[in-house]
Amino acid sequence: MLFRSVSQSRYEQKVKTAFFKIGQTKIELLESTDPEGPVGKFIEKKGEGVHHVAFAVEGLQQTLDFVADKGVTLIDKAPRKGAEGLNIAFLHPKSTFGVLTELCEDPNK
């Protein structure tokens, strides 16, 4: 099998997610379950397509502190729980060339 799919619902974010892992790369598909949720509003405003890119990091809080010190605007000033039990935080697209950027850390590593 070339890829593995894992699905789950993120009720607080009003989305369903599906992950496809190909080697070391993981692709996450998002399906809005509510037009008033963050992804539903994004689709209404910008249309379907790429929502964000994500990067795995070690030391998420330290990374957030580092990029904030460099002038990057943070959406999340502290990590929060995301899909697959990861700790996540988002950087504002105005600071990342118009691309919503997610930083992820596996708390089990």
Where are these regions (language model features)?
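Short, small-residue-biased leader/transition segments that mark boundaries at the very start
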Residues: 1-2
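Vicinal oxygen chelate
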Residues: 18-21, 40-109
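A short, acidic/glycine-rich surface segment
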Residues: 6, 36-41
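Carbohydrate-associated surface elements
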Residues: 29
